[in-house]
From Swiss-Prot:
EC number annotated for this UniProt entry: 3.5.4.38
GO cellular component, one term: cytoplasm
Oligomeric form and interacting partners: Can form homo- and heterodimers with APOBEC3F and APOBEC3G. Interacts with L1RE1; this interaction inhibits LINE-1 retrotransposition. (Microbial infection) Interacts with HIV-1 Vif. This interaction triggers APOBEC3D polyubiquitylation and degradation by the 26S proteasome.
Subcellular localization, as worded in the UniProt entry: Cytoplasm; Cytoplasm, P-body
More details: It is one of seven related genes or pseudogenes found in a cluster, thought to result from gene duplication, on chromosome 22.
Organism: Homo sapiens (Human)
Record-given protein name: DNA dC->dU-editing enzyme APOBEC-3D
Residues that coordinate or bind Zn(2+) 2: 262, 293, 296
Record-stated family: Belongs to the cytidine and deoxycytidylate deaminase family.
Function description: DNA deaminase (cytidine deaminase) which acts as an inhibitor of retrovirus replication and retrotransposon mobility via deaminase-dependent and -independent mechanisms. Exhibits antiviral activity against HIV-1. After the penetration of retroviral nucleocapsids into target cells of infection and the initiation of reverse transcription, it can induce the conversion of cytosine to uracil in the minus-sense single-strand viral DNA, leading to G-to-A hypermutations in the subsequent plus-strand viral DNA. (Microbial infection) Enhances hepatitis B virus/HBV replication by excluding restriction factors APOBEC3F and APOBEC3G from HBV capsids.
UniProt-reported outcome of changing residue 337 to K: Resistant to HIV-1 Vif and abolishes Vif binding
Length: 386
């Protein structure tokens, strides 16, 4: 690979930033992706800055009559691929946890997403947040699927807001001491793209990848670095005590600076908008990586109080801040409104693995301490609810 492409730049010129990061939803003539990255190493509760830089690459492979241009436009020279090649080439230790943030002018293409998905699966010690200035061909079904695949792979996908642009301007642009100046319709463009991405990601996923399940559903008593919640659900429409319709899926936190939408809220929003009918009875089961926070527990309890036709059972892998009285009261409020709250045991993990994980027919492999932690968490939950 060309070393001039593989090695990052420190900054870009002001005109380059304004021209390539303009957040107009439909924009022509920008055939390059610019990627500003920030890599941090997690150490305890602190994130230590490790490196920053800028990559540039073509949006899509193109045929060029000039051989040198043809080489440059190859897929491996996309900005995302340049970053992965550079990052993996540093031979970083597997026992370190890395937090990567990309600020990109365009969201990644499908071939890049395939590589990013594989990279995340092979590096469970890495988390990736992608803040995009624009969405590439977002009206096309295949490109919407690209965003869903990133989301499903565990990457956090969001639209760049004012704070993101100002941060990029300060850290990745030769700004000569000048402040970032938003352009005409900046806020309107952000709102439009934000709504579009939220709509794309609002529907449940079919399943998750094995490395995500093993990382996020491991029933540790102290689970550092699990900063988001995953929720697997089954929903049955019942008539005369028999199921006549079934649906299942997976939700995860949406990275939303306005609402910080937890997985429970994602489910309620989807369920109320697309499914709920007052004359139908529902049996809903959740398998969650974390028990609900006080705010989500309160919303779910209020929902159950208003909808007596919904019966909810919650199996949780871990108890979130179980020593905190607000979290304890949240669990109690769920129980008081009729929700059955339980700790996930071995059979529940196996059931999740079979129904919500792309397992390729591989069996579930229990981790050391699963049964011991289950008993401890079960006893703790019983003490909270009694």
């Amino acid at each position: 690979m060309n070393p001039q492409i593989r090695n990052p730049m420190e900054r870009m010129y002001r005109d380059t930033f304004y021209d390539n990061f303009e957040n107009e939803p439909i924009l022509y003539g920008r055939s390059y992706t610019w990627l500003c990255y920030e890599v941090k190493i997690k150490r305890g509760r602190s994130n230590l800055l490790w490196d920053t830089g800028v990559f540039r690459g073509p949006v899509l492979p193109k045929r060029q009559s000039n051989h040198r241009q043809e080489v440059y436009f190859r897929f491996e020279n996309h900005a995302e691929m340049c970053f992965l090649s550079w990052f993996c080439g540093n031979r970083l230790p597997a026992n370190r946890r890395f937090q990567i943030t990309w600020f990109v002018s365009w969201n990644p293409c499908l071939p890049c997403v395939v590589k990013v998905t594989k990279f995340l699966a092979e590096h469970p010690n890495v988390t990736l947040t992608i803040s995009a200035a624009r969405l590439y061909y977002y009206r096309d079904r295949d490109w919407r699927w690209v965003l869903l695949r990133l989301h499903k792979a565990g990457a956090r996908v969001k639209i760049m807001d004012y704070e993101d642009f100002a941060y990029c301007w300060e850290n990745f642009v030769c700004n000569e001491g000048q402040p970032f100046m938003p352009w005409y319709k900046f806020d309107d463009n952000y709102a439009s793209l934000h709504r579009t991405l939220k709509e794309i990601l609002r529907n449940p996923m079919e399943a998750m990848y094995p490395h995500i399940f093993y990382f996020h559903f491991k029933n540790l008593l102290k689970a550092c670095g699990r900063n988001e919640s995953w929720l697997c659900f089954t929903m049955e429409v019942t008539k005369h005590h028999s199921a006549v319709f079934r649906k299942r899926g997976v939700f995860r936190n949406q990275v939303d600076p306005e609402t910080h939408c937890h997985a429970e809220r994602c489910f309620l929003s989807w369920f109320c908008d697309d499914i709920l009918s007052p004359n139908t009875n529902y049996e809903v089961t959740w398998y969650t990586s974390w028990s609900p926070c006080p705010e989500c527990a309160g919303e779910v309890a209020e929902f159950l109080a208003r909808h007596s036709n919904v019966n909810l059972t919650i199996f949780t892998a871990r108890l979130c801040y179980f020593w905190d009285t607000d979290y304890q009261e949240g669990l109690c409020s769920l129980s008081q409104e009729g929700a059955s709250v339980k700790i996930m045991g071995y059979k529940d993990f196996v059931s999740c693995w079979k129904n919500f994980v792309y397992s390729d027919d591989e069996p579930f492999k229990p981790w050391k301490g699963l049964q011991t932690n289950f008993r401890l968490l079960k006893r703790r939950l019983r003490e909270i609810l009694q």
